[in-house]
Amino acid sequence: MEKKTVSVVMCTYNGEKYLREQMDSILAQTYPIHEIIVCDDCSTDGTMNILQEYATKFPFIKVHRNTRNKGCNQNFHDIFYQVSKKVDYIAISDQDDIWFPEKIGKLVQLIEKEEGYNLCFSDIISSPTYSRQQTKDYLPLPFTAESLF
């Protein structure tokens, strides 16, 4: 059976603090990644330098920079139009997420196991170096389009 292809999309804005760690965690996935597409929203820190460094080393990383700041929602909306038409799944990444190596493999396995799944997500585990709280099941299950938006 042929493996499903996965593209990762990430939007950035002044994300240099955790960006290297996140890029490394995506590259360390045990499941193959078809492409990584990053769209920067006019960062003023070293984000673009880091992204260009990774794109030079790994040709399947495509980096785009907006000509004007669009904001998070519009940036994510637009990035989906840059994904290759040949991929089966799109994984959404934030610039400060650090993924476990098996994340994509487990999500693909789950979505393939259950007929009719169109969306799959995972909880977060916070770290002492991050200010976020750990969340559990933040969407009611089963959820509907109305509960998502």
What are these regions (language model features)?
Residues 1-149:
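Nucleotide-sugar donor-binding/catalytic module of glycosyltransferases
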